Amino acid sequence: CIKYVVLNVGDLFGAGCGSNGMSVGDVFGGFLLNQGEGIIYGLIFVVLTMLIVMGGVSGGIEKFCGIGMPALFVMLLICIIRACTLPGAVNGLKYMFVPGWAVANGVIAEAPSIFEVISTAGGQMFFSLSIGMGAMITYGSYLDKKEHLEKNAVLIIVMDTLVALMAGLCVIPGRFALDPDGTLGGPKLLFITMQNVFSRMGGLGPIFGILFYLLVVFAAVSSSI
């Protein structure tokens, strides 16, 4: 994601670090094959995580989350407003919220079974909420005895679900509006379809691209720390 922040900055200012007229698919494929570039960006992420963690719980992690989480919500809202106001974005909203619409309109061949839905949602739930990983034991060791655990648990679940819905509203409407044939899932949705969307927004596209990929960087760093 740091790579794509740099890419959009390059496109915004016409610098050499931009896409330089290459197709988004070629940019993504080239990055996957470029081991040196992957190592560099990986090290940048590791160093960034280390610097935050070295600040301790209150001076590093809490300070970052205190700034990063509000910034994440602001960037999400900006991207949602832009995505949902694009011509054709309504099809993305129908895909997300209208049962049977995707099958009826040929977006997907057939609806997944209830067991597939439960399996996918359950896997995401366990991963997103860090259930069964021992993470809560680690976090719990830093909590004050006056903390209301039940209230915090409910709040975490509600906010996690809200952010997931907001992320969907940020991505899916844009895909249907500006890249209707783009991938609907996996890394290609993030790095090919969404970059296509930003490339087709015109002059403001790189700005929204920078905001979007910074948003993903914030989310990744908050998970890594």
Indicate where each model-derived feature is located.
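Alpha-helical transmembrane segments in multipass membrane proteins, preferentially the mid-helix core
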Residues: 48-52, 137, 225
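Inter-helical loop and helix-membrane interface segments of multi-pass membrane transporters/permeases
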Residues: 1-58, 87-119, 184-191
